[in-house]
Amino acid sequence: MLYAEPRVPNLNAKELAAYLADLCSWATVELREEFTAFWLGRLSEAEQDRAVARLAMAWAEARLGPAGPRETPPLPMEVRYEEKRLLDPTSSAMGLLYDGLAVMAALRELIAAGERTRQHLHLVLTNQLLATPDPGGRYHCRVALFGYPCLLSASGAVEGPAKPRAYYLAKQQARLSGIVAAELAAYGAVDAQAYLDYGDARLTAVLKGYAAQAVAYHLTGEPFCADRGCRLFNAHWQEEMLF
């Protein structure tokens, strides 16, 4: 089951579904609307209200700060913000970073029991920035989170893999001129084709690789391949992701 993300116009969910259907010729690939809208639409009005309240609280609790996970309960206004975002498929929390594993657990509860099985792969496209901690506890932005459901972040494809080294060198050298000047200098120092940016037409092709990794993970428990030319390669740099 592939769930569309209407907030990302340059992400072609139909093309991605066709790719998965060709890759997994033994399986049925179903393209569905946005994940939350799909599952909320199958609940009664009272059930929807309760589900939205639970989800909004979960998203608010999963929001990460500069130091990592929050240490205090979410403010009512933060929960209301998440409620509004959940009920409007066109809204987006751009710039906010969430604990990906906490989000995954919250979304899992929406899936009907009959589809919460090993026979079903749920692949959720999202525009939210998701992160997981490294062994030292430092959170890193991710493109893909493999679990149940699997999550693919369009924003994560832009922000997760590191940009070319020239980008960071130019940014460091120009930082004394101010943050904006540093960003402009960094982007100007690198060929635009060397990294993925917002609105990039290459996003769908990039996410095909991560979708293939999700399938591999679901079938074998191992999503990656050591071959740099393989779609299953675990890219840490933008240039590896776009290879």
Model regions and ranges:
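Zn2+-dependent metallopeptidase catalytic core
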Residues: 9-30
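Acidic carboxylate-rich catalytic motifs and surrounding loops in phosphoryl-/glycosyl-chemistry enzymes
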Residues: 30-38, 226-230
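Short, surface-exposed beta-strand/loop "edge" segments at domain boundaries and coil↔beta transitions
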Residues: 7-11, 131-134
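Short hydrophobic beta-strand segments
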Residues: 1-10, 37, 123
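Metzincin-family zinc-dependent endopeptidase catalytic domain
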Residues: 37-224, 234
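Hydrophobic beta-strand residues in large extracellular and virion-surface proteins
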Residues: 1-2, 20, 29, 152
